[in-house]
Amino acid sequence: MKFYYHDNDSSVDQCAPHDSGEPVTAEQLEKIGVLAFHYPDVEDVNRLAKERKYTNRDEVTITPEAMGGQENYEKKLKVFYEEHLHEDEEIRYILDGEGYFDVRDKDDRWIRAQLNAGDLLILPSGIYHRFTLSEKNYVHTMRLFQAEPKWVALPRPVDNNPYRQEYVKAISA
């Protein structure tokens, strides 16, 4: 697991590392409500799920083949990479492969989280973010949910959304 500021070079493929060379600490992530853990054993994930009342989960594999071919895969990656927020926490545990979550800091700068097998990321509801795979084009992830599994993305801008407003208030305190 590695965190750093995104280089914002849009001339380079979104699946490239985009490492600006400016690292981000766990403390900086916590200030924006992002939690990150490394759990080599799924039993650790089960304990966290019980503590945080995550009652449902599923698994998703993202590859060109799993998405029904290259064209569908590229369309799906574009959807994931569009900046958005959710009204629920987003919890992802990487079982295999790797991917990137980009989250906005308090100054609206992108922080990139490089996640590999065993890494778990919790994004608070209301945070603007996006996801993409690495250049390996493969990730197998477990999604955890506090209620029924759902994935409703609200594209930016939705600053008047009550979950967004609550999030901004929480990180401004």
Swiss-Prot record:
Needed co-factor(s): Fe(2+); Ni(2+)
GO biological process: L-methionine salvage from methylthioadenosine; methionine metabolic process
Subcellular location, principal: cytoplasm
Record-linked SUPFAM superfamilies: RmlC-like cupins (SSF51182)
Subcellular location: Cytoplasm; Nucleus
Positions bound to Fe(2+): 84, 86, 90, 129
Annotated stretches, region: Disordered: 1-21
InterPro entries: ARD (IPR004313), ARD_euk (IPR027496), RmlC-like_jellyroll (IPR014710), RmlC_Cupin_sf (IPR011051)
GO MF, one annotated term: acireductone dioxygenase (Ni2+-requiring) activity
Top-rank EC class of the record's enzyme: oxidoreductase
Reactions this protein catalyses: 1,2-dihydroxy-5-(methylsulfanyl)pent-1-en-3-one + O2 = 4-methylsulfanyl-2-oxobutanoate + formate + 2 H(+); 1,2-dihydroxy-5-(methylsulfanyl)pent-1-en-3-one + O2 = 3-(methylsulfanyl)propanoate + CO + formate + 2 H(+)
Cofactor note: Binds either 1 Fe or Ni cation per monomer. Iron-binding promotes an acireductone dioxygenase reaction producing 2-keto-4-methylthiobutyrate, while nickel-binding promotes an acireductone dioxygenase reaction producing 3-(methylsulfanyl)propanoate.
Pathway assignment: Amino-acid biosynthesis; L-methionine biosynthesis via salvage pathway; L-methionine from S-methyl-5-thio-alpha-D-ribose 1-phosphate: step 5/6
Pfam families per UniProt: ARD
One cellular component (GO) term of this entry: nucleus
Binding site for Ni(2+): 84, 86, 90, 129
Keywords annotated in UniProt: Amino-acid biosynthesis, Cytoplasm, Dioxygenase, Iron, Metal-binding, Methionine biosynthesis, Nickel, Nucleus, Oxidoreductase
Record-listed E.C. numbers: 1.13.11.54, 1.13.11.53
Family membership: Belongs to the acireductone dioxygenase (ARD) family.
Biological role stated in the UniProt entry: Catalyzes 2 different reactions between oxygen and the acireductone 1,2-dihydroxy-3-keto-5-methylthiopentene (DHK-MTPene) depending upon the metal bound in the active site. Fe-containing acireductone dioxygenase (Fe-ARD) produces formate and 2-keto-4-methylthiobutyrate (KMTB), the alpha-ketoacid precursor of methionine in the methionine recycle pathway. Ni-containing acireductone dioxygenase (Ni-ARD) produces methylthiopropionate, carbon monoxide and formate, and does not lie on the methionine recycle pathway.
Protein name per the record: Acireductone dioxygenase
Native organism: Yarrowia lipolytica (strain CLIB 122 / E 150)
